[in-house]
């Protein structure tokens, strides 16, 4: 199947953990997500903890596998996207499904790259080279953000995400 840019290929149910083994949890009331101390026994379905990672085929050569993320909370589906707010790129979650086909550029696509093992990755935002999903402390939890790295090969533990 050929398309202009990205065609949905498959998806996997996953849990996303940061370098501190904290679990990514999406909060629909604030349209964002953060990493929290959650054990495997505390994980519940449809509570913003169990993500789907959608793989896309692309006609353009890319630095890594194009992926998008979605999550279900209380029988509603949300997808991860990036938007500019007050001159800064932020990670948001919007109600809806990830599209099957995406023509052209998209604010939901990230390039999955190996970090340093087969289970640890970093995810580069497709619309801005050098911008990666990361986390930063905010109050009692670590908020999911986009972070600019000065060099592509820079090792930054805040961008490491374990699947």
List PLM regions with ranges.
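Lectin-like carbohydrate-binding module/patch detector with strong preference for beta-trefoil
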Residues: 1-163
């Amino acid at each position: 199947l050929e398309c202009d840019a990205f065609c949905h290929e498959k998806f996997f149910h996953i849990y996303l953990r940061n370098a501190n083994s904290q679990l990514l949890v999406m909060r629909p009331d604030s349209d964002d997500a953060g990493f929290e101390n959650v054990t495997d026994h505390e994980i519940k379905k449809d509570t913003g903890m169990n993500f789907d990672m959608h793989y896309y085929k692309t006609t353009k050569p890319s630095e890594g596998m194009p992926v998008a993320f979605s999550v279900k909370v209380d029988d509603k589906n949300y997808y991860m996207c990036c938007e500019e707010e007050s001159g800064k790129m932020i990670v948001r979650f919007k109600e809806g499904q990830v599209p099957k086909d995406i023509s052209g550029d998209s604010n939901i696509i990230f390039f999955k790259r190996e970090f340093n093992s087969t289970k640890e990755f970093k995810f580069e935002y497709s619309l801005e080279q050098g911008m990666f999903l990361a986390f930063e402390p905010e109050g009692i939890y670590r908020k999911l953000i986009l972070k600019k790295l000065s060099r592509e090969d820079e090792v930054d533990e805040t961008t490491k995400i374990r699947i």
